Amino acid sequence: MIHRSDGFIAVIDGATSKSAIRWSGERSGWAAARCLDAALGTLPADCSAREAVDRLSAAIRDVYRREDRLADLEVHPHRRLTASLVICSRQRRELWFIGDCQALLNGELICYPKEVDHIVTGARALFLELQLLQGSSVDALRENDRGREYILPLLKQQALLQNHPGGGPLWFPVIDGFAVPDEGIRIRPLPPGEVMLVLASDGYPVLKDSLAASEAALRALLQEDPLLFRKFRATKGMAPGYISFDDRSYIKFKLQSQD
């Protein structure tokens, strides 16, 4: 989801649901994105990254209280409303990263991939290779992604690492209604003068300086590796009938020196 307001431009990437819980009929990723989009619209233009993250977390937490789910979600983090964001603060001229969204700053890629993803996607890739060696096919595994099923227990349990530096190098920051440690808020000051920016979700494995080029790179990848376990490793492949493996958000804009 893309947010645009006088103070901020942002990409909000709601996490794929890993439970059957619905929030007013919506899956958790979409519900999280809608909540955070609304909350971003209430932020003061001059607020700091720390203040913004705290307010966004509070907005999610308010949903938990209204739904009377706070106690359950304290002990079952995989059921939470969870999202990653990259936010451009116009007034402070900063990029704020919480999670694994990405950006291009005058052509320079800025991203913070999760170490735990390398482990989990590697496990899925290994499982799929073994399935192929035992007689399965890429088409059959696209129809029934047994690799995704294989890692799903890990995907649920890795939520324990959300905003939890006690998890060592495998912990990762997200907005999920609970406190985000300071070190989980990455701030990138923008240089003076005019800058060209691209903000995007991680649904673009190869981020380019135009939407058309990013889409073309994605199509080429999916044509070569639709299961996404060899050329690019993901936690799920592209299912039949779909045009990609993940939601995608992309916005390109110029920030003037006076902005």
Regions found by a protein language model. Give the residues of each.
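PP2C/PPM-type serine/threonine phosphatase catalytic domain
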Residues: M1-D259
